[in-house]
Each structure stands twice: as structure tokens, then as C-alpha cells.
């Protein structure tokens, strides 16, 4: 605020806007509140991003509990009470969530093959690993989505923003894909797995061609057609 005061007094509109926001923000921070919870207009949010404040970043809590507590988070154990308290605080003060993981279990899972890991989790009464839950929660918080490409040699996942249309999603692979975009062949991951192969998915009518306005969905398996 002090740095821009002189420029603001000389009529610099950008400096005036930054000073005005700083004057609104400082008492909020002095009260021990994170910048994320300050109600701002769209233009103010844009300015705030330029301040690079840690407390303006999206927030997600991770609670580490013991192996025996993971399947009994509704109980009266000390760990369960702490988890509920963190979740309540996160919701009330930051409007965010909390993911529960067990570092002990994650360490054991890292040494197991996928099928054994799945059986191990089932025996604990949980469906997914803590790391998997943490990744999905972070993606949701940041507005990110994943689509897949597959071929004879490899299958790859690509990260895009929610709402990205097919050309923009193609550009994540290479700018030429976006520049010369023609169409995208789409099949959902679930349909592809259920059918067993791309050929059978085509026979079942699960493959379709989409154009430039198609919004790529989480879990889409995509083959781009382009020409440059």
C-alpha cells in the first residue's frame, strides 16, 4: 500500500485499485483471517492474485490417523474427534474440506501390487488409498480434470481445466494439435473398460466424434484428429 500511495495520488488507476484493496485487506489479515475469506469482486480478486499471498491460495487439510482409526472416524476415539474438529474448522473458516489418510497404511500400500493393495484396503473397510483421495480432492479444489490417450505403446493421462473444450485439451499435448484441430474421437474410460477394447466399444456405439465446442469430461479417452 505504501509503495503505491504516491502513484495513486498522481492518478494512476492501477495503483489506486491496489491501494484500495490493500487498505481493505490489511485489517482483515490483522484480525487473523486468511485472505481467501475476504469477500471481493472479480476485479479485486484479479488484483489479489498479483499480491501472491499464501493465505489467498485454495486450501485443503490432510489429517493423518493411525491404521485402527481409519475405518472408525465416526467413533469416540481421540483421532476421530480431531478429524471432526478439523473438518468443522475447515468448513466454517475456509469453506474447504479435509482428507483423512494414514501414513502408516500408505507406506504399506506402496510395497504391494495393485490387486493385493485393493484387497488390503477392502480388509480395512475403505475403498481407496489416502493418496488417491488426496489427489482427487486437490484436483476438484483446483478445478482440474484428467483425460486419457492410449496407443500400442503407452497410455497417458493429461491434466486440463474444468470446462476446457477439445482444441484446448489437445493443445496440452502439443500446440499443433490445437492449431490444426479437426475433431476428437471420444469414449469414456468406463465404457472402454466394460467393452474390453476400442473395436468392441465401436461396435457397441460407445465411440463418437466431437467437434470444437465439445467440453472434455473427466475420464474421457480421446484420439485427436488434426491437420497442420
What do the predicted segments below correspond to?
Residues 2-217, 222-228:
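C-terminal-of-GTPase-core extension/linker across diverse P-loop GTPases
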Amino acid at each position: 500500500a505504501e509503495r503505491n500511495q504516491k502513484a495513486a495520488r498522481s492518478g494512476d488507476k492501477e495503483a489506486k485499485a491496489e491501494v484500495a484493496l490493500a487498505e481493505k485487506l490489511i485489517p482483515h489479515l490483522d484480525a487473523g483471517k486468511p485472505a481467501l475469506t475476504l469477500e471481493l469482486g472479480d476485479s479485486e480478486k484479479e488484483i489479489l492474485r498479483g499480491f501472491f499471498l499464501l493465505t489467498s491460495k485454495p486450501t485443503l487439510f490432510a489429517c493423518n490417523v493411525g491404521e485402527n482409526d481409519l475405518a472408525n472416524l465416526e467413533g469416540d476415539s481421540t483421532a476421530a474427534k480431531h478429524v471432526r474438529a478439523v473438518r468443522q474448522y475447515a468448513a466454517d473458516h475456509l469453506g474447504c474440506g479435509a482428507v483423512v489418510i494414514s501414513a502408516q497404511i500408505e507406506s504399506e500400500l506402496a510395497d504391494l501390487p495393485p490387486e493385493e493393495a485393493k484387497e488390503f484396503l477392502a480388509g480395512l473397510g475403505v475403498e481407496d488409498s489416502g493418496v488417491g483421495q488426496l489427489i482427487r480432492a486437490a484436483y476438484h479444489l483446483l478445478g482440474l480434470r484428467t483425460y486419457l490417450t492410449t496407443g500400442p505403446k503407452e497410455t497417458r493421462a493429461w491434466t486440463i481445466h474444468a470446462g476446457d473444450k477439445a482444441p484446448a485439451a489437445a493443445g496440452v499435448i502439443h500446440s499443433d494439435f490445437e492449431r490444426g484441430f479437426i475433431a476428437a474421437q471420444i469414449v469414456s474410460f468406463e465404457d472402454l473398460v466394460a467393452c474390453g477394447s476400442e473395436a468392441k466399444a465401436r461396435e457397441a456405439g460407445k465411440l463418437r466424434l466431437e467437434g470444437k465446442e465439445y467440453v472434455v469430461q473427466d475420464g474421457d479417452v480421446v484420439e485427436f484428429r488434426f491437420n497442420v
